[in-house]
Amino acid sequence: MDAVASLLGNASGIPPPCELGLDNETLFCLDQPPPSKEWQPAVQILLYSLIFLLSVLGNTLVITVLIRNKRMRTVTNIFLLSLAISDLMLCLFCMPFNLIPNLLKDFIFGSALCKTTTYLMGTSVSVSTLNLVAISLERYGAICKPLQSRVWQTKSHALKVIAATWCLSFAIMTPYPIYSNLVPFTKTNNQTANMCRFLLPSDVMQQAWHTFLLLILFLIPGIVMMVAYGMISLELYQGIKFDASQKKSAKERKASTGSGRFEDNDGCYLQRSKPTRQLELQQLSGGGGGRVSRIRSSSSAATLMAKKRVIRMLMVIVVLFFLCWMPIFSANAWRAYDTVSAERRLSGTPISFILLLSYTSSCVNPIIYCFMNRRFRLGFMATFPCCPNPGPPGPRAEAGEEEEGRTTRASLSRYSYSHMSASAPPS
């Protein structure tokens, strides 16, 4: 590529190219002037180290809990296990091999690791994204299309989908080990250094490749997740409205029948012939019906709160996906179509923090999908009994967590979810 050759030779006075992320293209600008702020490298190292430790710790705990606890091997958790593995790969094979060359202004790991890290980085990003899409579709099918989804919502089907996801990702990213190579250059102090570069034979191929990645790893997955979680939120919102109408109807019926008798138009009163079993139990227990009513009311309120929490969590998932990945995909597309302008504006500190933002997804995924779920926390306590137990929650919190757990696993049918508050509390 003539344009790249001229940039590497710095013939026009333009700094050598910066690598912008997804493909591990060295991720730094060589021979750049030192940062204007002396504290910037220290802050960069601190933030990278923090994200690295959180990601390794969080995903390792998720993998350990899901593997050692057989009771947690549900369909959704199988996808979460695959997601944790891909996020751990993203952290281990990307962050060190991006941060260290950035600081040293030299890719010191050799040609083999240049090819390997670019390949594993692309694969881990692809697997992570496709896993997020699979989780959203699995939840959508279980909540919004329960009858149709029963056929394929099995562990064996989930394992097949995960295997296909990994194989597809490895196949898609095969250009990286083929076209990633070390490119030597001479610094201003006459020292020789190397850049790990992913360079396709032509500018058109480079543009087509980054456009392809933008579509299959960002735009299309983002749209699918927005639609799936939007439909789930709509389903839950309709359930909330149904609960509210049922509660209102129950209050009206209670007000109209509070005296235990009915009045017709002639002014006569008709006493009920047979009291219900619930009334008999209330009389025998000396007002125990009030406690049953309070439990029912508490469970209904907890169910409502749980549904609202799930809706908020789904919104957070979509927002974080776009927040973490939009900057880096936009930067890669910008560089593919306008290399000079992108490298001038994004070199050095800006691209380093854009990359850091994309790596943040590998540490927030375990928090959103696992540690916010009470069943996973209980599984964690069972796997690591040395950890302190926070103690049993109250009845209202327990009912809400139970409902939220069922919703997060997407195991309820549309009818049962929408009519939860109309049914009696489980015995």
Curated annotation (Swiss-Prot):
Glycans are attached at residues 10, 24, 190. Belongs to the G-protein coupled receptor 1 family. Residues 391-427 are annotated as: Disordered. It is found in: Cell membrane. Residues 411-421 have a biased composition (Polar residues). Receptor for cholecystokinin. Mediates pancreatic growth and enzyme secretion, smooth muscle contraction of the gall bladder and stomach. Has a 1000-fold higher affinity for CCK rather than for gastrin. It modulates feeding and dopamine-induced behavior in the central and peripheral nervous system. This receptor mediates its action by association with G proteins that activate a phosphatidylinositol-calcium second messenger system. This is Cholecystokinin receptor type A. Its main location: membrane. Keywords: Cell membrane, Disulfide bond, G-protein coupled receptor, Glycoprotein, Lipoprotein, Membrane, Palmitate, Receptor, Transducer, Transmembrane, Transmembrane helix. A lipid is attached at residue 386 (S-palmitoyl cysteine). SMART domains: 7TM_GPCR_Srsx. The chain crosses the membrane at residues 42-67, 78-104, 116-137, 158-178, 211-234, 313-333, 349-372. It holds the Pfam family 7tm_1. Residues 68-77, 138-157, 235-312, 373-427 are cytoplasmic. InterPro entries: Cholcskin_rcpt (IPR009126), Cholcy_rcpt_A (IPR000596), CholecystokininA_recpt_N (IPR015276), CholecystokininA_recpt_N_sf (IPR036472), GPCR_Rhodpsn (IPR000276), GPCR_Rhodpsn_7TM (IPR017452). Residues 1-41, 105-115, 179-210, 334-348 are extracellular. It is a multi-pass membrane protein.
